Amino acid sequence: MSAAPHISVLLDEVVEALDAKPGDVVVDGTFGAGGYTRAVLPTGASVVAFDRDPTVRQFAANLPADRFRLVQARFSEMLDELGPESVEGVMLDLGVSSMQLDQAERGFSFMRDGPLDMRMGDTGPTAADLVNTLDHAELAKILYVYGEEHASRRIASFILRRREERPFERTLDLAEVIERAVGGRKGAKVHPATRSFQGLRIAVNDELGELEAGLAAAERVLKPGGRLVVVTFHSLEDRIVKAFLAERAGKAPGGSRHAPPVAAGAAPSFQLISNKAIAPSEAELAVNPRARSSKLRAAVRTDAPVWEAAG
């Protein structure tokens, strides 16, 4: 398999925010090519990494067996694997990796022809399953809510009309239909299929549901004083992380529509490290333009009990 090397975003900032010490246990919830894990191991900490993608095991081959373990599972399953108050750090790097984008056979890219898959793991329905079976309303909702695509109804109409002739099987086939639906704007920096592909990818992998479950799991596995560090890549992810941390830090009056309601008067279970998200430097963007939309948010676990759902 050939792919451009994956560059971990905000790497120095993640390591600084984690502040891992020798003997600590840190969760890398999104192992990928192992960039964050490799940056944390020199601190003397141990890393338990999670990834639903079985192909990433190749990147774990040379890591120290006494301080590293890779679990093929979603990061939302970390509580089942590790138990409560068991780690000093949790880091999550959300979204699809450049490694996956660059592999045409994974079906994430509208620039490279491949099977219309988009699964981060090897189970569950594919993007082709969705575009070939969902009705107009369901498909338009995915494109609008998850892709933030304002032409969602028109795109859905074009997709349904075309699939009457033959089912969608390839990424470029779908991208071309979307481009016909919305038209390519001359000089546009963003490909017309960008938002639609994002929406389908999020739906295929239940990324937002996984994020909410993962944040709740991190709250439970962190010891008091442990640190949660999350890197997001689009506004849907960042809003969920921001709302979760603000609520758990007692800074969100009225609660969050992104998280389950919690009992009133709960003591803050997190303390924010910074009230503002950290963005990549100009120097990093010059080396890795894909980092441009990334944001880092971090918080420290207090000794307060885990917030429980109300009712």
UniProtKB/Swiss-Prot annotation:
It is found in: Cytoplasm. GO terms for molecular function: rRNA (cytosine-N4-)-methyltransferase activity. S-adenosyl-L-methionine binds at G34, G35, Y36, D51, F75, D93, Q100. GO terms for biological process: rRNA base methylation. It catalyses: cytidine(1402) in 16S rRNA + S-adenosyl-L-methionine = N(4)-methylcytidine(1402) in 16S rRNA + S-adenosyl-L-homocysteine + H(+). Keywords: Cytoplasm, Methyltransferase, rRNA processing, S-adenosyl-L-methionine, Transferase. Pfam families: Methyltransf_5. One of its GO terms (cellular component) is cytoplasm. Its EC number is 2.1.1.199. The keyword Methyltransferase applies. Belongs to the methyltransferase superfamily. RsmH family. Specifically methylates the N4 position of cytidine in position 1402 (C1402) of 16S rRNA. This is Ribosomal RNA small subunit methyltransferase H. It comes from Caulobacter vibrioides (strain NA1000 / CB15N) (Caulobacter crescentus). The gene is rsmH.
